[in-house]
Swiss-Prot record:
The keyword Cell division does not apply. PANTHER family: GMP REDUCTASE. One of its GO terms (cellular component) is GMP reductase complex. It catalyses: IMP + NH4(+) + NADP(+) = GMP + NADPH + 2 H(+). Belongs to the IMPDH/GMPR family. GuaC type 2 subfamily. GO terms for molecular function: GMP reductase activity. This is GMP reductase. NADP(+) binds at residues 204-227. Its EC number is 1.7.1.7. PROSITE patterns: IMP_DH_GMP_RED. GO terms for biological process: purine nucleotide metabolic process. Pfam families: IMPDH. It comes from Exiguobacterium sp. (strain ATCC BAA-1283 / AT1b). HAMAP family: GMP_reduct_type2.
Length: 327
């Protein structure tokens, strides 16, 4: 493994601008036969997405992945989205009952456009078996598999039939896998992304460790097709979870998918809970992300996301903020 680095260690180098206005830059991305307005997807976590948020995102041309923590509602969710003329994108685990669920989808004719196999350690026989099961019964579904952190894992999951892989083991703000187990991509997520992307022949979704909008551009530069983000999407008007006031500030809860708050028990806990300041409307954040990404594309010297993939960069060991705190 050569020298590793993370988002704050990298600065992209500007190239000559070819547009008159950043609004000419196109930040759309294609995935699974759909074109989405941004290469960004809110994390499939209980305090980030629910049916209402999924509906808002799908209606407005954004990608979403519904979480898997209310399994009994998934079939109705797929039906509802399809009745509205929208795409359905769900998550599954790898437990025995999930095999039956996939068979039910086949027998009832409800094929979701996207299925994400969502477990903490995705480089496993359990995930490979589930990919094969889904591809056998629902060949029309675009399968995203994860999470992984090595090129070997990417190659194996692609070979098993995954249409995209999700890269990131524990770099998230409410993930404590790195602390509880000693394993993960926390602190070198961007290097892990580059390492995995070099082995990939299909799209990669970078998952975790995004703290600023500039990190989205950096993810694209190092090989991501799509970027999954939790903390920046937490705490909005539409976000699930309780809002409350403390010291005159409006706060909302945000917790990890392997936390006791999500599990309802203290067993194999690898997530924690935090409180984030209330951020207002989700659309405002999406619009700001879009504008920042358009600016990034203009700095890259192009007019589409492709321009970001080839820009030069420098390594600046942990110094780029000089103590500035933007977020």
């Amino acid at each position: 493994m050569d020298k590793v680095f993370d988002y704050e260690d990298i600065q992209l180098i500007p190239a000559k601008c070819i547009v008159d206005s950043r609004s000419e830059c196109d930040p759309t991305v294609e995935l699974g036969g759909f074109t989405f307005r941004l290469p960004v997807v809110p994390a499939n976590m209980q305090t980030i997405i629910d049916e209402k948020v999924a509906l808002m995102l799908a209606k407005n041309g954004y990608f979403y992945i519904m979480h898997r923590f209310n399994p009994e509602t998934r079939l109705a969710f797929i039906q509802d989205m399809h009745e509205r003329g929208l795409y359905a994108s769900i998550s599954v685990g790898v437990k025995d009952e999930e095999y039956g669920f996939i068979e039910v989808l086949k027998s009832t004719g409800h094929t979701p456009e996207f299925i994400t196999i969502d477990i903490a350690h995705g480089h496993s026989n359990a995930v490979i078996r589930m990919i094969q099961h889904i591809k056998h019964h629902l060949p029309g579904s675009f399968v995203i598999a994860g999470n992984v952190g090595t090129p070997e894992a990417v190659r194996e999951l692609e070979h098993a039939g995954a249409d995209a892989t999700k890269v990131g083991i524990g770099p998230g703000k409410v993930c404590i896998t790195k602390i509880k187990t000693g394993f993960g991509t926390g602190g070198w997520q961007l290097a892990a992304l580059r390492w995995c992307a070099k082995a990939a022949t299909k799209p990669i979704i970078a998952d975790g460790g995004i703290r600023t909008h500039g990190d989205i551009a950096k993810s694209i530069r190092f090989g991501a097709s799509m970027v999954m983000i939790g903390s920046l999407f937490a705490g909005h008007d539409e976000s699930p979870g309780e809002t409350f006031e403390q010291d005159g500030k409006q706060l909302k809860e945000y917790f990890g998918s392997a936390s006791e708050f999500q599990k309802g028990e203290r067993k194999n806990v690898e997530g924690k809970k935090m409180f984030v300041e209330h951020k207002g409307a989700l659309q405002d954040t999406l619009t700001e992300m879009e504008q920042d990404l358009q600016s990034a594309i203009s700095y890259a010297g192009g007019d589409s996301l492709e321009a970001l993939r080839t820009v030069d960069y420098v390594m600046v060991k942990n110094s780029i903020f000089n103590g500035d705190k933007v977020y």
